[in-house]
Amino acid sequence: MTAVALTSLICALAGSWVCAEEFNAAMNSIAIPDLRAHLEVLSDDAMEGREAGSRGGRAAAAYLSQKLAELGLQPNGDADAYTQTFERGAYRNLLAVWEGCDADLKHQYVLVGAHYDHVGYGTRRNSRGPWGRIHNGADDNASGVSGVLEVAEALTLLDPPPKRSVLFALWDGEEKGMLGSKHWCANPTVPLRDVAMAFNADMIGRLRGNTVHVFGARTACGLRRWTSESNPSAELLIDFSWEMKANSDQFPFVQREIPTLMIHTGLHDEWHRPSDDADTINYEGASVATRLLFSLVVQAANQSSRLEFRKESRSESPADRERLEQPAVPRAPRLGIAWKTQDGQRSGVTLSHVTRGSAADRAGLQVGDRLLRLGEQEVADESRLGAAIWAASSPATIVVERAPGEILQLSVQLDGEPLRFGFSWREDMAEPGTVVLVEIVPHSAAFLAGLQVSDRIYRVADRDFCNGDELGQLLASLPSPVPLLVERSGRLQTVVVDAPSVP
């Protein structure tokens, strides 16, 4: 799917409150020079590692408060200030609001957060060493804070603003146990019941393998699909983690049953070391992760209805994911033959193997036979033979040439039922209207189209479906070829399956 098509889809999902060109311009304002500028200030030695309550932490808060004011965001802290102090005034969250445009929905909030503190000079309790040196925390988490500032600036370019208000929260004290986000959840500056969704950007500066990690996609139904449809890059891969750990500022919101997503680009050797410096940042990757965050925030702020928290997400684990995506037991072959690669000189295919006891063996097929016809279909070459075998009715008439000029017509009782497409699926309770492929039959139409196990099917011939039964009815009724909207690792693509008819 092209970037233009993705942008159009995102705007459509967001209710088309702005044109695609305006949305795209706002997204493109998220630029490497601006990300770099914020990140280099926050991770400079002058900030002394931004430990909560320290001189460097206060300097970082002053810089960030100034940037929030320059963007024209409304203060949402104590006494009409950007700061919310806690721990006897030693620590300070920074809070600002961009008001929504909808008369009713603007009283709901999409919270976008990142912690700005780090570990200062490092100790044995919070550093992987060496200790006593400035830990600049460029990735952890100057990168996330810089991304949130860029999202805030991009939102100010949209006219009108999104329907819901967006609350930007820069947390203090995360490295001391998520103190800032915990304090805010216990002492919210907007009613907690009005927070429709929360986002957390933590360590988004070290994109590798073009893969971003998203946590929390099971905290509401449909979030994986929602995230994939918001992916602004046709190249970006998304790893949807099922882990639910108390390891960053999204967790206090999960505890309060608020749908939550965290954007993350992975741990690395520099994590919690003095070497986590600005020159190690993948700025291009950080801009891609930030654009994904922007797309998600825009969609969350414009949804017509709020997402409901999935309580089951708190107990789900990677082991549950493995069970869902576990490939199905392979099917037994219907005919039981193998054939030689075509030489391009003659029609038909020459059998190189006949499995003992198989349908082919029972019908009398032999190695060396040249298969010319299967049912009503002439075997011109090997490319579609496998799909034809899987789709054929039984018994089937097979025509072979055994010796030059010796043509035989055999009746074969094929094993198993006909398969038009050659894939099977499971349903995921967290993703209604989606199926997870768990079987791709070798040489089937699905196999030839390039479908893979763990692919998700979202649409069939531009039609949604409610469940697997409805999908099965669609697949049985549509003429070939059949276009499928498929998600693979967070990327959308259209896969066209040339499925033979099943009698």
Task: Please provide the spans of the model-predicted regions.
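Bacterial N-terminal signal peptides
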Residues: A3-S16
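Second-shell loop/turn segments in exported
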Residues: F23-S29, D45-R55, T85, P130-N141, ...
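A non-catalytic alpha/beta surface segment that caps or lines the substrate-entry region
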Residues: R50-E99
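Alpha-helical metal-binding/catalytic segments enriched in His/Glu/Asp
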Residues: A96, L105, V112-H118, T123-G177, ...
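His/Asp/Glu-rich mid-to-C-terminal helical/loop segments that flank catalytic regions of hydrolases
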Residues: L157, D269-P318
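Metal-dependent peptidase/peptidase-like ectodomains
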Residues: W171-H268, N282-A286
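Conserved PDZ fold ligand-binding element
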Residues: A360-S383, A446-D469
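PDZ-domain C-terminal substructure recognizer with occasional recognition of PDZ-binding tails
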Residues: L372, G386-L419, Q473-P503
